[in-house]
Structures are given as structure tokens and as C-alpha cells.
Regions:
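Alpha-helix-loop-beta-strand connector modules within alpha/beta enzyme cores
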Residues: 78-105, 172, 176-178, 230-238, ...
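Catalytic alpha/beta core domains of metabolic enzymes, predominantly
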Residues: 130-269, 280
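Active-site beta->alpha loop and helix N-cap motifs at the rims of alpha/beta catalytic domains
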Residues: 81-163
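N-terminal small/glycine-rich loop or linker at the start of catalytic domains
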Residues: 18-44, 145-149
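Conserved, mostly hydrophobic/aromatic
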Residues: 52, 59, 70, 129, ...
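Active-site mouth loops of central-metabolism enzymes
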Residues: 32-54, 106-114, 158-163, 184-186, ...
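Glycine-rich, proline-tolerant flexible connector loops at the mouths of alpha/beta enzymes
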Residues: 40, 65-88, 214-215, 272-276
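C-terminal helical cap(s) of enzyme catalytic domains, especially alpha/beta-barrels
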Residues: 141-150, 276-299
């Protein structure tokens, strides 16, 4: 087990590491696209593979060690796809420009996708992939997608549920284990710890357990300092946690993760604004900002090699 792993529940361990500037280097994951909103929300959001690869490269140069990928449907860039060929193409193009960045694919997919469609991306050979721990409900208004954007549509109210059963979660965890894919368990509220502990008891996930605390989305925990601290107190031993704050909560939740020795996810999937009323110019803008703030707070930034060690991934990047 890496020396970077420590018990985040122990305030004395945190104090000792903070006083000696020995918190683990910060893994910065960038979620470049997402599976819900698109260029109608921010014209700078990458949808096509070429756009995704270009922005990933800029984020990699800025210091991101992991990229979280949603592939879009080339017949309708406004929607997601589970086609493993689409994911494989993106993976291969990114690997050519970013030789050691960690490739993290979504199995959460996009609204309206059944389980069978969402898991097809595993055929694209990711190094790690998201593993949702329960159903998600959506209720949000998507802006009208107007020409000259491709695939225009009217404003729509998204009122949907991404259903996930215990059996499906177990099946997906087993698939990942059999293929050597490290699951990133997406925890939206405290009840999901029941599922995590069930997976641990079945030996379907391996140490260190990568757990992403998602706060601020509908039906997830409210994005407050108190809720985040409570979630950290319930982490299993030998865990690595990252924090994904949604919308305006992205920056404050990321700052707390930096302080507490966790890791961060930023990017346009979760927040298309740099501040109120000001759209992000690129995903790299979000990466550059969080790295600047982390360094000001004496957190080193993890290289892809260090991130692989922290997460228990192979030191040899995947090839395509």
C-alpha cells in the first residue's frame, strides 16, 4: 500500500501530515464533457472527439493526471452514446497526445440510457471507470440548442431516473475486477456506504478503495462543509477519496478536499461557469485555477505516475 494512503478519519494523522507538509500530492481529474448539457450551456464545451482530445491535452499540460470521458453520439452531438468504438477512438487519440494520463470512462452514461448501454464502454479498455452506487433522479431544465449548433432542439425539462439495482452494481463491479479496471465508486449520499461495504465484503473491489464524494446534484447530499466532513468520517479504511462539487459548489468543495488531503474533480461536466455570469473559456481554465490554489495551500500536484501509485493502478499506461 502506498505511503500516500492515510486514515482520513483520524484528525491527529491529518494534523501531523499537514504540519509536515506531507499530505499526498493532489490528483486533479478533469471531467471534460458529461452526458447531459452541451454547447447550448457553454459553447466552449467539447463534444466531438477532436474537441475532447484537444481540451484534454491542454488540461494534461496544465497538470491534470486523469480525464473522465463521456462519448457523444456522432449522429447527435447533443446526446451521449455507450458505443465502445466511440470511446476507443477517444482513448486512442488521447493516449497519442497524453502518453500517461489516466483514462477514466463513465458507466453512468447519459439520461435515458439503460444499464446494458451504459456498461458497453468497458469494451474500450479503460484504466478506471465510474461505478454508480444507486439510482439517480434528474430534474433540471436544459437550454434550447439553437442553430448554427448541430442537432438543434427546443428547451426541455429533464425529468428522469437512472435506475440501478444491487444486482447490476454487483455485476458491473465483477466485470471491472475481471478486466483489471479500477472502479471509482460514486457516492452521492451516506446510504451508499451500505453498497460500498457490501462490495468490500464480497471482495469485488480492491484496496485502496477509490471513492468519489459527489455533492450538490439533485438527490445527492447537499454541498455543505458539514456534509462533506460527515461523509469523510464514514470512509472505509484504506480509502482514497476525491470530491466532485456540482455547479457553483465545485470550487468550495474542491477547496475543502485540498485542505483535508483528498483529491479533486473539476471541469465542464460539473460546472460550465468560472464565476457567476462568466462562462469557462476551457476545461484547462478550471484545471489551472485549482492547481494554482492548491499550490498556494502547500499541496503538491500529482504527476500521472504518482496518481497511478496512489490509486493502485499499473505504472504502465494502457495502449490502444
Amino acid at each position: 500500500m502506498s505511503n500516500y494512503i492515510f486514515d482520513h478519519r483520524d484528525p491527529y494523522e491529518w494534523s501531523k501530515r499537514t504540519a509536515s507538509s506531507s499530505l499526498p500530492p493532489l490528483i486533479v481529474c478533469v471531467a471534460i464533457t458529461g452526458g447531459v448539457h452541451g454547447k447550448e450551456a457553454n459553447p466552449n464545451l467539447p463534444e466531438t472527439p477532436v474537441e475532447q482530445v484537444a481540451q484534454t491535452f491542454d488540461c494534461y499540460r496544465a497538470g491534470a493526471s486523469m480525464v473522465h470521458i463521456h462519448a457523444r453520439d456522432p449522429k447527435n452531438w447533443a446526446t451521449g452514446t455507450g458505443d465502445p468504438g466511440a470511446f476507443y477512438e477517444i482513448n486512442a487519440m488521447i493516449r497519442e497526445k497524453c502518453p500517461d494520463i489516466i483514462l477514466n470512462l463513465t458507466t453512468g452514461g447519459s439520461y435515458g440510457q439503460p444499464f446494458e448501454e451504459r456498461i458497453r464502454c468497458l469494451d474500450a479498455k479503460p484504466e478506471t471507470a465510474s461505478l454508480n452506487l444507486g439510482p439517480e433522479m434528474y430534474k433540471s431544465r436544459l437550454k434550447a440548442r439553437k442553430a448554427p449548433l448541430p442537432n438543434p432542439r427546443e428547451e426541455m425539462l429533464l425529468n428522469d431516473c437512472s435506475c440501478t439495482t444491487y444486482e447490476e452494481i454487483t455485476t458491473l463491479a465483477k466485470m471491472m475486477k475481471d478486466r483489471g479496471i479500477r472502479p471509482e465508486m460514486e457516492l452521492f449520499h451516506p446510504g451508499h456506504y451500505w453498497v460500498i461495504n457490501d462490495l468490500i465484503s464480497q471482495a469485488l473491489v480492491e484496496k485502496p478503495y477509490k471513492i468519489q464524494l459527489v455533492l450538490g446534484s439533485i438527490t445527492a447530499s447537499y454541498a455543505t462543509p458539514w456534509n462533506l466532513m460527515s461523509l469523510i468520517q464514514e470512509l472505509p479504511a484504506n480509502s482514497v477519496f476525491s470530491v466532485a462539487g456540482m455547479g457553483p459548489f465545485q470550487l468550495p468543495m474542491a477547496m475543502m478536499a485540498i485542505i483535508l488531503g483528498g483529491h479533486v474533480r473539476v471541469g465542464m461536466e460539473d460546472n460550465v461557469y468560472s464565476k457567476k455570469g462568466e462562462l469557462l473559456q476551457s476545461n484547462a481554465t478550471a484545471v489551472e485555477r485549482i492547481i494554482r490554489l492548491a499550490r498556494d495551500m502547500n499541496r503538491d500536484i500529482a504527476t500521472p505516475s504518482q496518481a497511478r501509485e496512489i490509486l493502485g493502478l499499473s505504472s504502465t499506461p494502457s495502449s490502444y
